[in-house]
Amino acid sequence: MDKLRITGGSPLRGEVTVSGAKNAALPILCASLLTAEPLVLGNVPQLNDTSTTLRLLGRMGVRAERAGDGTVTLQADQVDNLEAPYELVKTMRASILVLGPLLARFGQARVSLPGGCAIGQRPVDQHIKGLAALGAEIEIEHGFVVARATRLKGASIRTDMVTVTGTENLLMAAVLAEGQTVLENAAREPEVVDLAELLIKMGARIQGHGTDRIVVDGVARLHGARHDVIADRIEAGTFLCAVGAAGGDITLRGAAPDTMGATLDKLVEAGLTIETGPDWIRGAMHGRPRAVGARTHEYPGFATDMQAQLMALDTVADGTAVIVENIFENRYMHVQELCRLGADIDIDGHTAVVRGVARLSGATVMATDLRASASLVIAGLAAEGETLVDRIYHLDRGYDRMEVKLRALGASIQRVTGKETA
């Protein structure tokens, strides 16, 4: 099992390119099921999750070709299998995103209940409720969501909570439904907007994406399109937290700063010097960061996917920070590992109190989920001595060659196999 060996204490300097957003790429790949015509997607990140999605689509009969420049061409003109099996779905919760497209275009689907990071229940009941409102007959059989419909019919749907994947699934189902669908309490995330922009290029009629009320007028069919996946705001924020903790001066190319308002505000509050352009961000930290608290919230609030990285920055900051996790339960599993490095953190329910320390010291730590992995890498970059991060397959689910990019910024970080760490 691969690990990362990090020798901390070196500031980060230079520039790297931000990859396409995982959380946009996954639903966009699944949208290929909505048409028999080719879909050409640029800026698709090379991640375990995108590879799993492509394997899942391939199992269904979707033909996919990946070019060296990050372009993926998909064509779903020979789909002959409408099932997403547990063996693929168990590793990635986003596999549920094939449910809406399959149901809308083919009238049936059989999708295993999902897995993914162990950071809370994240139930799919809102997906099921919404699809049922569109006229689908849905049952849970032997661990599978089994759905059938002759043709979906437009409806007004209000989800009980803001759900990103739920909004995306219902959006993809609604574009081929008969009549108008109104999604109330819809997710406003940039990744939802990116999916909607692709669907519009494919011939969908969508209004209101980026707000909490999306209106979809269904069409009979969609056609092929060309689309570039939006930049990953979480990857960009992770690298900025890294320079905040380790010090230095970095520039991120291919970024989307207009999607990162809440994160950039927190980093400025922490003492980073931030400069932005249309597609770049420069972040510099000279001296010790200031402790900064945060409450996670749906977009445009502070993202839950940035909570662990900000906490890693706070572990070496001057002062005390209070972080409140409002989105998911069980998302403080990185805390005990940060404490192994010398962090001073107390947890009380959804609240974490982080007292900054003058220095962290390297140790062996274990990643527990995707963003927790990133927080341990950040802490390792700031720590004195050597840190070994185990179970980095979590990291590979959502970061495109993180150690390669960090080395380009001057970090001492190497991927090693289990044998090499003995």
Curated annotation (Swiss-Prot):
| Involved pathway(s) | Cell wall biogenesis; peptidoglycan biosynthesis
Q: Which family, according to the similarity comment?
A: Belongs to the EPSP synthase family. MurA subfamily.
Q: One Pfam family of this protein, by short name?
A: EPSP_synthase
Q: Which domain of life is it from?
A: Bacteria
Which EC class is the enzyme in? Answer: transferase
Where is the PTM 2-(S-cysteinyl)pyruvic acid O-phosphothioketal found along the chain? C117
Q: Give the enzyme's EC designation.
A: 2.5.1.7
Determine if Protein biosynthesis is one of this entry's keywords: no
UniProt keywords, alphabetically: Cell cycle, Cell division, Cell shape, Cell wall biogenesis/degradation, Cytoplasm, Peptidoglycan synthesis, Pyruvate, Transferase
| GO BP annotation list | cell division; cell wall organization; peptidoglycan biosynthetic process; regulation of cell shape; UDP-N-acetylgalactosamine biosynthetic process
The residues the record assigns to binding UDP-N-acetyl-alpha-D-glucosamine are R93, R122, P123, V124, D125, Q126, D305, I327
Task: Give the protein's recorded name.
Answer: UDP-N-acetylglucosamine 1-carboxyvinyltransferase
Organism of this sequence: Bordetella pertussis (strain Tohama I / ATCC BAA-589 / NCTC 13251)
Location within or outside the cell: Cytoplasm
Q: What's the encoding gene here?
A: murA
GO cellular component terms given for this protein: cytoplasm
Q: Which reaction does it catalyse?
A: phosphoenolpyruvate + UDP-N-acetyl-alpha-D-glucosamine = UDP-N-acetyl-3-O-(1-carboxyvinyl)-alpha-D-glucosamine + phosphate
Q: Does the keyword Cytoplasm apply?
A: yes
GO MF, one example:
UDP-N-acetylglucosamine 1-carboxyvinyltransferase activity
Major place of localization?
Answer: cytoplasm
CDD domains to which the protein is assigned, alphabetical: UdpNAET
